[in-house]
Structure formats: structure tokens, C-alpha cells
């Protein structure tokens, strides 16, 4: 067979088979079994960088910061003051709180605080905070509280007799005979009221019939209610007496069976 007649595909397959046989022979001969590390070369070893010396401790012990807390740097008097997140100094909140009530017993202690004219809270000693206020100590006329304005001692406010509205005068209050009520200051006296005219005596009309009785009128123009006559008063008394006798008989009739047993 001539070489010119062999195709390209045949040459490609023959090349692959030849290389495969070569690799198999080398593997059987021990190819790759004697892989070893090269000896160390001192010239190739790089020098490690030197670490800098440790710096001294900058923060220092925690005890040093106690002086900063005792003498704050941003305070004008270098004294500690309460810190407010709202941005105010708390004087407005502290000035509006007033102690208006104290309740002291052997087992219960409570104080009433007035925050504004329309709002008040009740805080109990040893209890939870109410609207940011907590009761720390309570005395008969003072209380120590902790709130947005810090810790403060409030004195119990009592009425000193000044200000407020005067008591309402009662119209039907009896007065001593001959007593004259005092006039308010800077008020002119009321003009004298003319005496009412005497009541006219009803005249007997011809025929023996009395004229109709006209109820007397008061000075203010209102008519007075007619008074009951003697016959009406007598009839009312008789009804009351009859009712009393009836109740007495019923009471005696109900107690008689119990007495006979």
C-alpha cells in the first residue's frame, strides 16, 4: 500500500495512538514517582518587616474619668448639671409642678402633683413612674420627686385666703331679727321701696254674695299663691289622723298573732 493513498484522518488517529503508547510506557517506567523538593536557598529568603515598638496606653485607667464627670469641661461653673434631650433646661417643667395633696397611712403613701390647671397625676411611694415623675420620699407637708427637671423637693401648697371666688350666698339663709346684711364696698345704697298700698276691704254686693277674692300682688309684680282656708286645713288634718289610725291598726293586727304563740 502506498503512503500517498493514506488519508488525513488516518494520520491523525495514528499520531494520537502513538502518544498514548508513549505515555503508558513512561508511566510504567516510573515517571513522576521521584518528585522531591529543592533544597533551601538562603539567597531567596526575604527578611520579615520589623514591628514598631508598642505605643504607651492612651486611654489610661477608668478611674481618671471620674474627675471629668465631677468637673465637666463645658459647664460654666465646672459642676455637674442634669442633661436634657429636649434642648431646654427643665426650669419650665419644674416650675409648673406643684404638690397639691398628700395621703399618708401606715401601709400606703401617695402624693398628688398638679402639672397644669387641667392635668394632675398621683404617684405612689415605691411605685412606677407616672408621666415621668417618681415619688422618692413623702412627708406630711412635703414630697421629694424625680422627674424631667431632676430631683426636687416640693412643699404642700395650702390656700392662704387670698384670691379665688367668694362663696355663693344662699338666698333662703335665715338671718337674725333686726340684722342688716352688709353692703359690698363701693356700691350705692338701694333706693327706698315704697310701701305697698293697704288691701281693700271687699264690699258686700247686693244679693248676699261676696265678690271674688283677688290674690294680693307683691311689689315685684308677681302674684302670691292663695293660702288654704280653714276648712281645707281641717280636712288635711283629718286625713292624716285617719291614716295614722289605719297604720296603727295594721301594726297591732300584725303583732297579735306573734304574741299568742
UniProtKB/Swiss-Prot annotation:
Chain spans, region Disordered: 158-261
InterPro entries cross-referenced by the UniProt entry: XpsN-like (IPR048187)
Biased segments, Basic and acidic residues type: 227-244
Intracellular or extracellular location(s): Cell inner membrane
Main localization of the protein described in the UniProt heading: membrane
Domain of life of the source: Bacteria
Residue ranges, compositional bias (Low complexity): 201-211
Keyword set, alphabetical order: Cell inner membrane, Cell membrane, Membrane, Transmembrane, Transmembrane helix, Transport
Organism: Xanthomonas campestris pv. campestris (strain ATCC 33913 / DSM 3586 / NCPPB 528 / LMG 568 / P 25)
Cytoplasmic face residues: 1-10
Comp. bias intervals (Pro residues): 179-200
GO CC list: plasma membrane
Summary of subunit composition and partner proteins: Binds to XpsD.
Protein name, per record: General secretion pathway protein N
Positions in the Periplasmic compartment: 32-261
Function of the molecule: Involved in a general secretion pathway (GSP) for the export of proteins.
Membrane topology of this protein: Single-pass type II membrane protein
Membrane spanning residue stretches: 11-31
Amino acid at each position: 500500500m502506498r503512503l500517498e493513498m493514506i488519508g488525513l484522518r488516518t494520520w491523525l488517529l495514528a499520531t494520537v495512538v502513538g502518544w498514548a503508547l508513549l505515555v503508558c510506557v513512561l508511566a510504567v517506567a516510573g515517571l513522576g514517582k521521584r518528585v522531591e523538593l529543592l533544597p533551601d536557598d538562603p539567597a531567596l529568603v526575604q527578611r520579615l518587616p520589623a514591628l514598631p515598638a508598642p505605643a504607651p496606653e492612651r486611654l489610661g485607667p477608668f478611674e481618671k474619668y471620674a474627675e471629668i464627670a465631677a468637673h465637666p469641661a463645658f459647664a460654666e461653673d465646672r459642676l455637674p448639671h442634669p442633661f436634657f434631650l429636649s434642648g431646654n433646661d427643665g426650669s419650665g417643667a419644674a416650675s409648673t409642678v406643684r404638690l397639691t395633696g398628700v395621703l399618708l397611712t401606715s401601709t400606703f403613701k401617695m402624693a398628688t402633683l398638679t402639672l397644669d390647671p387641667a392635668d394632675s397625676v398621683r404617684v405612689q411611694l415605691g411605685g412606677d413612674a407616672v408621666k415621668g415623675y417618681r415619688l422618692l420620699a413623702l412627708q406630711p407637708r412635703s414630697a421629694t420627686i424625680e422627674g424631667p427637671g431632676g430631683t426636687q423637693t416640693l412643699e404642700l401648697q395650702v390656700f392662704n385666703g387670698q384670691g379665688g371666688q367668694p362663696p355663693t350666698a344662699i338666698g333662703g339663709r335665715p338671718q337674725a331679727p333686726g340684722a342688716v346684711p352688709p353692703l359690698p364696698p363701693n356700691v350705692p345704697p338701694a333706693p327706698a321701696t315704697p310701701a305697698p298700698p293697704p288691701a281693700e276691704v271687699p264690699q258686700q254686693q247686693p244679693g248676699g254674695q261676696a265678690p271674688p277674692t283677688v290674690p294680693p300682688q307683691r311689689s315685684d309684680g308677681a302674684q302670691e299663691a292663695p293660702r288654704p282656708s280653714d276648712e281645707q286645713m281641717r280636712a288635711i288634718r283629718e286625713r292624716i289622723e285617719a291614716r295614722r289610725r289605719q297604720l296603727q291598726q295594721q301594726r297591732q293586727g300584725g303583732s297579735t298573732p306573734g304574741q299568742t304563740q
